[in-house]
Amino acid sequence: MDDNVLAGLGSPLVRVSSPPETTVAAKVESRNPGGSAKDRPARWMIEAAEAAGDLEPGDGIVEPTSGNTGIGLAMVGAVKGYDVTLVIPAGKSVERRQLMRAYGATVEVVDGDIAAAKDRADQLEREAGMVQLRQFENPANPRSHYETTGVEVLEQVGDRRVDALVAGVGTGGTITGTGRRLREAFPEVRIVAVEPATNAVLSGGDTTGDEFQGMGPGFVAPNLDESLLGDARTVELPAAEAECRPPAREEGPPVGQSSGASSLA
């Protein structure tokens, strides 16, 4: 018997529709307790802050978020007894706000993009004495994926060779941490970043849009190790949303916009 839901972090690697002579597999991160890959850095960032003495019982946590990191922090905060305040741009989904509140978090909605949410979180950190975990630059974020996601992939592929890793980019944690672990095992692995066509900072394209849920923050996060990347692909939102439907209808796992984008890439 586990002590709490945090012991349930982890996800299966599942074969999906693939071209002939090729195996494509997806990490079904919705199987994490909070429903996404962001449960991993949420736990690691909080526990790193505790270990460093930066977060103590009675402290409040504040973080800007487009959704899933906030849900993960709200869940981990509920387990550990922290008050969590999350600042989210108005354009992000109402359903994510509802989940954050269901875990007991305070949700503050701001006009603008994630940069506006970061400014408000900075203000709350200064004025209310809250602890901000700073997911875009906190090394515990990619470390969580190096120690968990990457390790799981290596165990799950068995004696197969991994030729490529494809992942959406937001904070840079998933692709950096997982990519580093896979590169150690497979030096020739190709690591492909996926970003919105309307927020293509890596590809040098348009940066005017913020419609995607969960990726494309509009800047290159300090946590993103660009030296790992072999390529960056852009995907239009309508195409990503259309790509979400076949996996749920034909293979079972429901996926969101960023997964649809990665599948297209």
Task: Go through each PLM region and give its residues.
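PLP-dependent amino-acid enzyme catalytic core
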Residues: 1-265
